[in-house]
Every structure is written in C-alpha cells, then in structure tokens.
Amino acid sequence: MAKISQDVSSSRSKARKAYFTASSVERRVLLSAPLSKELRQQYNVKSLPIRQNDEVLVVRGSKKGSEGKVNSVYRLKFAIQVDKLQKEKSNGASVPINIHPSKVVITKLHLDKDRKALIQRKGGKAE
C-alpha cells in the first residue's frame, strides 16, 4: 500500500529514533492510556495522557487485575508507578514496579481545569 502523507516516514529506524529521542513534552503524549468503557461513554474520549492521581487497572502482564492510584509518571523510562504495586528486594526494602501506560486502563480521572479543557479540545464532553 502506498503512503498517503509524504511528511510521515515509514522507516522503522526513523520511528524508533523519534521514540527514543523524544523530549519530555512529546513523551507526555506517548504515555497515554485508554479510558475504561464507562469513562469513554461519559467523556466521549478514547484515551488521555496519564497523570499522577489517576486511578488505573492493569490489564496486561503478571500484575493483571491489580488496581491503584498512579504515584508517579516516569517519562524518562516510559513508565508509571502505581501505589499498590511494589516488589520486595532481597534486603527487605520495597520498590515500585514500573508499568507501561498502554498496559493499563484509566478507571477514574483526576480532573482539574486543564484536564477538562483538554477533553473539550479533543471533542469530548467534560462534565
């Protein structure tokens, strides 16, 4: 199939380079997560960049089914840390587990005026 837009590259190496050299501002959009079915109906938006204090449900991986609040969004590592997901080190200390946002579903949004404005811009209905 032919390329429709001449401005977008189909090259795998260029796509990978763009992904791994993305700035923090660009990584925010790359760290988006889908909304749950209820939220999708409520706000008429499919996915949003994930933020601290959003509540998420893990839908893939060994921690599938776990729920919790997002403690931090680690843009440098393309990961989020959820409050209830921790592993214990051999010395007894507990460390947070990093999860990619595409492997979670947002179940409750942390809304403020900026987030509501973003939903409006995306064509959704912020209530």
UniProtKB/Swiss-Prot annotation:
The lineage of its organism: Eukaryota, Fungi, Dikarya, Ascomycota, Saccharomycotina. It holds the Pfam family Ribosomal_L26. One of its GO terms (molecular function) is RNA binding. GO terms for cellular component: cytosolic large ribosomal subunit; preribosome; yeast-form cell wall. PROSITE patterns: RIBOSOMAL_L24 (PS01108). SUPFAM superfamilies: Translation proteins SH3-like domain. One of its GO terms (biological process) is cytoplasmic translation. Component of the large ribosomal subunit. Mature ribosomes consist of a small (40S) and a large (60S) subunit. The 40S subunit contains about 32 different proteins and 1 molecule of RNA (18S). The 60S subunit contains 45 different proteins and 3 molecules of RNA (25S, 5.8S and 5S). It is found in: Cytoplasm. This is Large ribosomal subunit protein uL24. Component of the ribosome, a large ribonucleoprotein complex responsible for the synthesis of proteins in the cell. The small ribosomal subunit (SSU) binds messenger RNAs (mRNAs) and translates the encoded message by selecting cognate aminoacyl-transfer RNA (tRNA) molecules. The large subunit (LSU) contains the ribosomal catalytic site termed the peptidyl transferase center (PTC), which catalyzes the formation of peptide bonds, thereby polymerizing the amino acids delivered by tRNAs into a polypeptide chain. Transmembrane segments: none annotated. NCBIfam families: rplX_A_E. PANTHER family: 60S RIBOSOMAL PROTEIN L26 FAMILY MEMBER (PTHR11143). Keywords: Cytoplasm, Ribonucleoprotein, Ribosomal protein. Its main location: cytoplasm.
